[in-house]
């Protein structure tokens, strides 16, 4: 039976019921709905709506229902209920009779679902924080293992300056730390309890909402009932935080896909996270990374969806808000599996050091060092930049690296060049010169790793 049937005389259309029912999606809020109902039983007992004995019986029945459904989750979806709240109430009435009909006193599905969803976001958010911290640890371990593996750094996907694989890992460590911070902040803002806000104007029973919030492990109650039942910022923020994190994961995936390609061959991926071709027997495809990259757009879509759903809703609750969950649930599922897969990819990754070093030695990645050398001899940087550009053009024509020019040849470009130029053009010198906070010099990388491990 619907929870709202008394007002209506005609039968609900079967098509409308199919369109309106949310149980196929919101069944995932079952545990939160039971936990919230247990807290609500205590709240209405505190204002004399039910006796202590009735409260005890309601809580026992709710806990029994929790155990039953955990043992057989299919009970929910085969119930025919409109939504998870209807399922819990109907199951409760089946257990304790008319006493079960008292539980909803002073409560609306509006504040009920708002509470359930915040509880769910808190629980899933904490699990996602743990996953992000796992990714952070894996990146840090890889950075420590490969801190001195030389590879080319890129701008515009053109070889730019030599860096190390450890430095690359630390870049994604920084991104992951921002993701962790963002999610923690979002969970802090979502840590308020809407229960007791009623449909929109507040419950008619003068209960202690601070105690109710504490019973559900929220930091405080919400402060405006209109906002409380219509607020979905926590959904938007979780989807937004996920979108930014997925963007970082997608960038990392793209880097690794390129590094793994035959054209680069800087890394090898384990068989655990790759697949083959149904036609070409030689193929080893980076499918885990490609799926991370692909699922990013799906997460973005859910963020745009909830923003669009909420953008023109008047206060307070509107049925449009029923559309808040499907996208959110998919975002959390997609983000979680992508974080798990990223950790698995990194744990089995091997750096092909000779190939990466060779690539770093090519592409005239030491050109900036030659310009800096000229500056050290007194030439203005802009002039030095122009001179080195001419040297590179000549080197390309001769198909040689800069360091293979004779001193006499180099002097034709700038007479101030001396024999001491050559030590400045080695890969080791290129790295060592970047000995500044955040730079790619090996001591800086080691210090950064040590500092992050010490936190």
Swiss-Prot record:
This enzyme's EC code(s): 4.3.2.1
Pfam families (UniProt xref): ASL_C2, Lyase_1
One GO CC term on file: cytosol
Pathway recorded for this protein: Amino-acid biosynthesis; L-arginine biosynthesis; L-arginine from L-ornithine and carbamoyl phosphate: step 3/3
Molecular function terms from GO: argininosuccinate lyase activity
Keywords annotated in UniProt: Amino-acid biosynthesis, Arginine biosynthesis, Cytoplasm, Lyase
Entry's localization field: Cytoplasm
GO biological process, one term: L-arginine biosynthetic process
Cross-referenced HAMAP family: Arg_succ_lyase (MF_00006)
Family of this protein: Belongs to the lyase 1 family. Argininosuccinate lyase subfamily.
Stored PANTHER family: ARGININOSUCCINATE LYASE
Protein name per the record: Argininosuccinate lyase
Native organism: Shewanella sp. (strain W3-18-1)
């Amino acid at each position: 039976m619907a929870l709202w049937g008394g007002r209506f005389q005609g039968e609900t259309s079967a098509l409308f019921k199919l369109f309106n029912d949310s149980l196929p999606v919101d069944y995932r809020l079952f545990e939160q709905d039971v936990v919230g109902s247990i807290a609500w039983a205590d709240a209405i007992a505190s204002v004399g709506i039910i006796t202590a004995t009735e409260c005890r019986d309601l809580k026992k029945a709710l806990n029994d229902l929790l155990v039953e459904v955990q043992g057989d989750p299919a009970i929910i979806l085969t119930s025919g209920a409109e939504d998870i709240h209807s399922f819990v109430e109907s199951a409760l009435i089946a257990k304790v009779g008319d006493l079960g009909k008292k539980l909803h006193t002073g409560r609306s599905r509006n504040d009920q679902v708002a509470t359930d969803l915040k509880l769910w976001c808190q629980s899933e958010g904490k699990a996602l924080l743990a996953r992000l911290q796992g990714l952070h640890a894996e990146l840090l371990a890889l950075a420590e293992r490969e801190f001195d593996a030389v590879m080319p750094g890129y701008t515009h996907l053109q070889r730019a300056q030599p860096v190390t694989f450890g430095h690359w890992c630390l870049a994604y460590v920084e991104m992951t730390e921002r993701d962790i911070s963002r999610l923690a902040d979002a969970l802090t803002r979502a840590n308020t309890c809407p229960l007791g806000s009623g449909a929109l104007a507040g419950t008619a029973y003068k209960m202690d909402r601070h105690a109710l919030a504490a019973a559900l492990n929220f930091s405080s109650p919400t402060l405006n009932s209109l906002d409380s039942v219509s607020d979905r910022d926590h959904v938007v923020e979780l989807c937004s935080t996920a979108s930014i994190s997925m963007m970082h994961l997608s960038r990392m995936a793209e880097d690794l896909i390129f590094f793994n390609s035959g054209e680069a061959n800087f890394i090898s991926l384990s068989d655990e996270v790759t697949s083959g071709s149904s036609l070409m027997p030689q193929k080893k495809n980076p499918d885990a990374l490609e799926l991370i990259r692909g699922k990013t757009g799906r997460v973005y879509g859910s963020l745009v969806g909830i923003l669009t759903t909420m953008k023109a809703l008047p206060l307070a609750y509107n049925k449009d808000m029923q559309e808040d969950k499907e996208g959110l649930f998919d975002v959390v599922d997609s983000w979680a599996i992508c974080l798990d897969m990223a950790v698995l990819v990194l744990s089995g990754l091997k750096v092909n050091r000779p190939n990466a070093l060779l690539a770093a030695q090519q592409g005239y990645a030491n050109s900036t060092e030659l310009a800096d050398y000229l500056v050290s001899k007194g030439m203005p940087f802009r002039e030095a930049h122009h001179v080195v550009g001419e040297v590179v053009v000549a080197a390309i024509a001769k198909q040689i690296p800069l360091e293979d020019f004779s001193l006499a040849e180099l002097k034709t470009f700038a007479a101030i060049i001396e024999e001491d130029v050559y030590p400045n053009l080695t890969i080791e010198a290129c790295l060592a010169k970047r000995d500044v906070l955040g730079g790619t010099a090996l001591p800086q990388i080691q210090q950064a790793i040590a500092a992050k491990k010490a936190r």
